[in-house]
Structures are given as C-alpha cells and as structure tokens.
C-alpha cells in the first residue's frame, strides 16, 4: 500500500510541475480507497472521486479511520448493493465534504462500469458527478 501511495504522490508532484490546475484524484475500487488516503498526504489535492472504495488494505490500513480526517470535497458512489457499505466507510468524515451518490435507476453498477456506455443508466452517475464538479467551481 505505502509503495503504491508513494507512486500516486509522485504523480501528483509531476502534474503540479506541469500545470497550475487543481488536482482531483479519481479512483475505482482499491484505487478509490488509495485516492482518498493520498488526498490526506498532499495539500495540492483539491478533491477526490472514489468509485466503489472499500477496505482493501486491512489490516495494515483501515481506510474508514484514515479518511475520517479528510477535509476536502469527496464524491463517492457505488452500486445499490454496495451503497450501505460505502456509506458506512464515509460515515466518519464531516458530511459537508461528502457527496455520496446512490443510484436510483436500476441496481447501479460497480466502479467505472457505472459510467460506461454499456451500462443502461450511466447518465444518472454522470449527472451526479457533473453536479459535484459544478460545486467545486
């Protein structure tokens, strides 16, 4: 976990050297969890989009405890089946920073598949994400 996080932080520094635009981390599954954790370590991260994050790094790292200190805008989504789990994962964060999207049309899908053209109801995910980005401006 820590080696991968170092790579993410190095990528953030690289982007900062090339652009003055805000950094928004975007990750799915374990990378969603990693993005949430990395956002704590780097002040240049403006926000995080985490698709189906979870406790993929236990026992070494407990993401729910780690992200409770995160005070940056976060968009978290999942399938309907995963929603109670990701909701619990984000429960320790200050709610003013959290946009937790639960799909209403169909069962939803996991990770990046929820945004795929192959998923019938992808538009509700895209709409929720665009509203999140609008609020960042």
Show which residues each predicted segment covers.
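C-terminal catalytic histidine-bearing segment of alpha/beta-hydrolase fold enzymes
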Residues: 98-137
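Flexible "cap/lid" loop of the alpha/beta hydrolase fold
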Residues: 54-71
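Conserved loop-alpha-helix segment in the C-terminal half of the alpha/beta-hydrolase fold
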Residues: 86-101
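Acidic catalytic loop of the alpha/beta-hydrolase fold
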Residues: 57, 78-85
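Gly/Ala-rich beta-loop-alpha elbow adjacent to hydrolase catalytic centers
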Residues: 26-35
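Alpha/beta-hydrolase active-site loop
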Residues: 1-18
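A conserved short beta-strand
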Residues: 43-56
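Short beta-strand/loop motif that positions the catalytic acidic residue
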Residues: 70, 75-78
